[in-house]
């Protein structure tokens, strides 16, 4: 019987761009959680956070070598881009899209499904927990070291 696993991913950003969090929850076919991981980062947009969550999840699932991996996300944009229905136009998403394509290669079979936010509660909770950590770190920076402008890194004076 093939090993079927389910990967739930979610990303969140405050400020769009702003502090961000990404999370992934890997479950077996019985719905039992095998692994979960979250990461705080930023500045990032919501869409970047969603892709970062998928990267995190694929890296987490790869060593377990499932025969079938079903990815579930509430990001319709990401699902449609990965299905080839939408082009990836945003410059900040292109490298993440390419990275996801590379990470998908070793998997035998991958399905990517759009689900409603309520069905992604565990990944959503972890992503928001990571977002809170990113906000805390951002709040602890001195004002002169905080991010400056859209998509820029840090400016130190």
Identify the residue ranges that each predicted region occupies.
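Intrinsically disordered, low-complexity regions
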Residues: 1-6, 34-35, 40, 62-65, ...
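Alpha-helix initiation/capping motif
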Residues: 45, 90, 142-144
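Juxtamembrane helix-loop transition sites at the ends of transmembrane segments
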Residues: 31, 49, 95, 101, ...
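Intrinsically disordered, low-complexity, compositionally biased regions/tails
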Residues: 25, 88, 153-155
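RNase H catalytic domain
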Residues: 9-16, 55-130
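RNase H-like nuclease fold core
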Residues: 1-48, 52, 59-63, 67
């Amino acid at each position: 019987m093939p090993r079927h696993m389910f990967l739930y991913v979610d990303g969140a950003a405050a400020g769009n761009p702003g502090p961000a969090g990404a999370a992934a929850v890997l479950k077996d076919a019985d719905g039992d959680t095998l692994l979960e991981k979250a990461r705080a980062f930023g500045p990032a947009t919501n869409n970047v956070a969603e892709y970062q969550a998928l990267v995190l999840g694929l890296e987490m699932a790869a060593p377990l070598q499932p025969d079938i991996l079903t990815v579930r996300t509430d990001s319709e944009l990401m699902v449609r881009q990965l299905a080839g229905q939408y082009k990836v136009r945003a410059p900040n998403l292109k490298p993440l899209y390419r990275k996801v394509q590379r990470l998908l290669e070793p998997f035998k079979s991958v399905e990517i499904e759009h689900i409603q936010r309520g069905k992604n509660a565990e990944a959503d909770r972890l992503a928001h927990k990571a977002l809170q950590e990113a906000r805390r770190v951002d709040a602890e920076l001195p004002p002169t070291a905080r991010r400056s402008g859209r998509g820029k890194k840090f400016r130190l004076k």
